[in-house]
């Protein structure tokens, strides 16, 4: 049994292995690493990340160009859960480095403070007349609570109550986080043009941004899993 994916896939493969043993089935389970989050232990990088990072970099490069003509504040929500690797890849889209977006980047490795966020957005907008922002879906407060959940409690919304089959809070399955941040900005800077997008599944499946190295490593990982399975070592 081969299961390709990240942490949840590894957990699922383990559950299947335990259940097979419990029922007396002869089954060997292999987890083949692949995750755009780039957060698996004992890895330098994960298959899937390179291609997704290219998509994010190109998306921000194009969005920054658009923002130069339709000036305002643009918030883009990027996947990654509790790892900021994919959001950090947004800066690879900067062309010259001078006033290129994203101008602000928010990762889950640091506590998200709404007050600081608004102050930084305002300062950037006043300096450049525009602002492009990269935000990880996993931003959270000092207690580790996802910001979307905090915002929902503050606003009386039910937007952050869903969890997946592994018990993980749904972070960017909808545009709720982007809308929440856009609303905060609109309240702090009334009259300002503010837009938000959630990249969603496109960033992990776009064929136009496949990394050659990523493609080769993914194939090698799958091949290694098959060799391990038929070798009888496991």
Can you say where each PLM-predicted feature lies in the sequence?
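Short catalytic/ligand-gating loop segments at beta-alpha or beta-beta junctions
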Residues: 194-206
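Anion-recognition interface
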Residues: 33
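Phosphate-moiety recognition in structured ligand-binding domains
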Residues: 205-234
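Residue-level detector of flexible, active-site-proximal loop/helix-junction positions
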Residues: 36, 111-112, 201-203
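Glycine/charged-rich beta-loop-alpha catalytic/anionic-binding loops adjacent to active sites
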Residues: 39-42, 72-73, 163, 203-208
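A short acidic, glycine/proline-enriched capping/turn motif at secondary-structure boundaries
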Residues: 8-9, 36-37
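Accessory alpha-helical/coil subdomains and C-terminal extensions
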Residues: 3-5, 11-26, 30, 46-195
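Short beta-strand elements at the ligand-binding edges of bilobed clamshell
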Residues: 40-53, 209-212
């Amino acid at each position: 049994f081969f299961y390709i994916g990240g942490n949840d896939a590894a957990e699922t493969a383990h559950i299947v292995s335990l259940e097979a043993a419990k029922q007396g089935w002869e089954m060997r389970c292999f987890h083949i690493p692949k995750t755009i989050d780039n957060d698996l232990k004992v890895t330098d990088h994960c298959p899937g990340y390179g291609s997704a990072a290219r998509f994010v970099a190109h998306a921000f490069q194009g969005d920054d160009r658009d923002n130069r003509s339709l000036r305002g504040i643009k918030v883009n929500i990027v996947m990654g859960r509790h790892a900021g690797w994919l959001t950090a890849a947004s800066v690879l889209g900067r062309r010259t480095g001078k006033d290129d977006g994203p101008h602000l980047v928010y990762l889950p490795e640091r506590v998200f403070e709404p007050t600081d966020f608004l102050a930084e957005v305002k300062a950037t907008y006043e300096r450049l007349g525009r602002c492009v922002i990269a935000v990880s879906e996993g931003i959270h407060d000092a207690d580790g609570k996802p910001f979307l959940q905090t915002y929902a409690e503050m606003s009386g919304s039910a937007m952050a109550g869903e969890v997946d089959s592994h018990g993980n809070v749904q972070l960017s399955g909808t545009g709720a986080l982007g809308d929440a941040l856009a609303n905060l900005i609109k309240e702090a800077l009334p009259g300002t043009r503010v837009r938000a997008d959630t990249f969603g599944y496109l960033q992990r499946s776009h064929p136009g941004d496949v990394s050659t190295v990523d493609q080769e490593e993914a194939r090698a990982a799958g091949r290694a899993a098959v060799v391990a399975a038929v070798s009888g070592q496991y």
